[in-house]
């Protein structure tokens, strides 16, 4: 039974990673999570931007970063420019503003493809977890630890878990696509 919990935990973690990845895909409005992967060299330590100051979303298409240490503004600005978010930071000496332009139709399609790719990667990971789980059960049967009926039952249970998490991934991707394509 612990084996099922282990498999389910791995599948949950895969879905959780997918959610984090989807949060970094920009939809029509500003989302502070888009900055989560950007780190800044702060006194020799790579530090996430959200640990260097306050991040707020005062308007639907604007993110404001207000660092606690104003000397780090230039570094934050430089790292945002180097990142792949495609936004030019506006530094006024106190805060950095990120103004998100409305998405073009072409950019929306690119982002939809990216979201689908993240979804496919997650599905591959789920199927890999299923395969590993079933292989372990087959090895147990081969060693005489479980019966043929136990193996069939285990395969069915693992497949049900797989179906559940694949459906959850499909739902997450569908929601993200609607969010991206929403004008």
From Swiss-Prot:
Keyword Repeat belongs to the record: no
GO terms for MF: ribosomal large subunit binding
Annotated CDD domains: RRF
Single Gene Ontology BP annotation: translational termination
InterPro entries per record: Ribosome_recyc_fac (IPR002661), Ribosome_recyc_fac_dom (IPR023584), RRF_sf (IPR036191)
A Pfam family of this chain: RRF
Domain of life assignment: Bacteria
SUPFAM superfamilies with a match to the protein in the record: Ribosome recycling factor, RRF
Keywords (A to Z) from UniProt: Cytoplasm, Protein biosynthesis
The keyword Acetylation is assigned to this record: no
Subcellular compartments: Cytoplasm
Entry GO CC: cytoplasm
Main location (coarse class): cytoplasm
Family designation: Belongs to the RRF family.
Its biological purpose: Responsible for the release of ribosomes from messenger RNA at the termination of protein biosynthesis. May increase the efficiency of translation by recycling ribosomes from one round of translation to another.
Name listed for the protein in its UniProt record: Ribosome-recycling factor
Record organism: Acetivibrio thermocellus (strain ATCC 27405 / DSM 1237 / JCM 9322 / NBRC 103400 / NCIMB 10682 / NRRL B-4536 / VPI 7372) (Clostridium thermocellum)
